[in-house]
A protein has these predicted regions:
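Polybasic, lysine-enriched low-complexity intrinsically disordered terminal tails
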Residues: 4-7
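Active-site-adjacent structural elements in enzyme catalytic cores
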Residues: 14-328
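Intrinsic-disorder-associated, low-complexity terminal segments enriched in Asp/Asn/His/Tyr and depleted
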Residues: 9-11
């Protein structure tokens, strides 16, 4: 009995060691490509990113070209440690250090004033720089091995549904792009973005780290800037995160009526419901994968039931509002 148990444990250790060796080789290959100015895709806890050497303007331009992304739409810089901030930000205010100590590594992006020498291609030509320290172990291993910052927007065509699985990235970019496997993304929605370039912090994009949690850590409320009064950040355009099939957002409780109306008009529709009691974190984790699945069904429209209006649904509600082509 004891020897059998020991044999099982030995086998598991061998499998784990072999898996670690394979991943180490893949990360080494990714680092080689990054240093050569090429692009790689890798997992984070939010979505899969399309990475480039953040110090290489030519590589950064490749990101914009491959995604079809406007050159004025900034990229998020990914770092391994908060200690690296001083190389990228002109100043690191105490508020930034407080939030980093509480929420990094994790799905929080801070917008700071950029340091001299930071490429315009990284910031979309504006002064502020957006930066975060991801929590996913593969992302962290890649950043540690690379030894510098990696710029990484979501690994999809601009404006489309973000990828939360390696297979999603390959669907977007079937050519010879190295994709590091990391399983399904744990969070599934993009990071919360907070600007600290002024005296009062501003919430620029909602995420799973809530405004209330940020305010509690800082001891002050966050402002929501008016349109055009804040730095440009990823995912801030009115139309974004959209499947190719037009998406219609339907008020809660009216999905059945919307289905009947669409079918009476001869439409083939697919649906995504949000039943009472649905957990916000689970919904957000699965949202993009489900939208991608529905997008392949050959329907004329995707009908999505609106999510609750409570604070824990802010991120999902924001993404659906931007993904929607029409509203009921």
């Amino acid at each position: 009995m004891t020897s059998r148990r020991r044999g099982t444990h030995d086998h598991r250790r061998t499998v784990v060691a072999a898996s670690m060796l394979v991943m180490t080789k893949k990360i080494d290959a990714a680092v080689t490509r990054l240093r050569a100015g090429e692009l790689v895709a890798f997992p984070t806890e939010t979505v899969y990113g399309l990475g480039a050497d953040a110090r290489n303007p030519v590589a950064l331009r490749k990101v914009y070209a491959l995604k079809g992304r406007p050159a004025t739409h900034p990229l998020i810089l990914h770092l391994h440690s908060v200690d690296e901030l001083v190389s990228w930000a002109a100043e690191v205010p105490p508020m930034a250090l407080r939030l980093a100590a509480r929420f990094w590594p994790g799905p929080l992006t801070l917008v700071l004033r950029r340091a001299a020498g930071v490429a315009d291609e990284l910031t979309g030509g504006q002064d502020p720089i957006a930066v975060r320290v991801p929590a996913h172990p593969v992302a962290r291993a890649l950043l540690a091995a690379f030894g510098s910052g990696i710029a990484a927007p979501s690994a999809n065509r601009y404006g489309r549904v973000s990828p939360t699985r390696a297979a999603h990235v390959r669907e977007e970019f079937p050519q010879d792009l190295l994709v590091l496997e990391g399983g399904d993304c744990e969070v599934g929605l993009e990071s919360t973005i907070v600007s600290l370039v002024g005296a009062t912090p501003q919430l620029l994009r909602p995420g799973v780290i809530s405004s209330a949690a940020l305010a509690a850590e800082l001891g002050m409320s966050l402002q929501t800037p008016t349109s055009g009064a804040a730095p440009r950040v990823p995912g801030s355009t009115a139309q974004h995160y959209a499947p190719q099939t037009p998406l219609t957002l339907v008020p809660a409780g009216r999905l059945d009526t919307a289905i009947k109306t669409a079918q009476a008009g001869g439409e083939l529709v697919v649906t995504l419901a949000c039943p009472p009691g649905t957990d916000a974190a689970s919904y957000g984790r699965a949202l993009y994968a489900e939208l991608r699945r529905l997008d392949k069904q050959g329907a004329s429209r995707i009908l999505v039931e609106s999510v609750p209006k409570s604070a824990d649904w802010d991120a999902a509600r924001d993404r659906l509002a931007r993904a929607a082509a029409t509203f009921v």
